[in-house]
Structures are given as structure tokens and as C-alpha cells.
Regions:
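Helix-turn-helix DNA-binding helix
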Residues: 42-43
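A short, conserved structural fragment
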Residues: 50-59
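A short acidic, leucine-rich amphipathic alpha-helix
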Residues: 29-33
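Short alpha-helical segments that sit at the start of domains
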Residues: 1-15
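Conserved segment of winged-helix/HTH DNA-binding domains
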Residues: 65-87
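Short, hydrophobic-biased segments on the C-terminal half of alpha helices
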Residues: 46-47
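Short helix-capping/hinge SLiMs at alpha-helix to coil transitions
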Residues: 19-23
Length: 87
């Protein structure tokens, strides 16, 4: 169902992880291992999702950690869609 609204496979996987686990914090390489995608593609999509406000990030040493912005205007709706599509 989400593939109709989110056409990028990598972006869809990222949204599913962060909507399903809103307290999840990780860096690009950790997420790449989790969803089995190329870190370069993940980095690009994380930046896009941060730009629209779905994700936030903070710099920790040489890496950047990404986490869900629970104040994102449609976060609850998106989370509900993800949970329903997983059932």
C-alpha cells in the first residue's frame, strides 16, 4: 500500500523503520545494514526526509545520527499507515 504513495523503495524502507520505531536513533551505516541498501542512496533519502521535517539529526563526532521528528504534522497518520500495511 505504501508503494503507491512513496515511490522510492529506499525512502519507503526508511519511513517504515522510523514510523514503526519512533525512538530509533541511528547513523547511515547502521541503517544500511538494517535495511540492506547502499549507504549512498540512504544518505540522499535521509537528507530529503530531514528537509521536509520527517526526520531530525544531530552530529556526533564524525557521524550524523538520524531520528524521527514526532512533531511532524502527519506523523501519526503516516505511522498508522505503516502499521496497517504491515498487518
Amino acid at each position: 500500500m505504501l508503494d503507491v504513495f512513496i515511490t522510492s523503495r529506499v525512502r519507503r524502507k526508511i519511513v517504515v523503520v522510523y514510523a514503526k520505531y519512533p525512538d530509533f536513533h541511528t547513523h547511515v551505516r547502521g541503517l544500511a545494514k538494517l535495511i540492506k541498501e547502499d549507504p549512498g542512496n540512504i544518505q540522499r533519502e535521509l537528507k530529503r526526509l530531514e528537509k521536509v521535517g520527517f526526520l531530525q539529526s544531530e552530529k556526533q563526532g564524525n557521524s550524523r545520527t538520524y531520528f524521527t521528528n514526532k512533531q511532524f504534522p502527519i506523523f501519526k497518520e503516516l505511522q498508522s499507515m505503516v502499521i496497517k500495511s504491515q498487518q
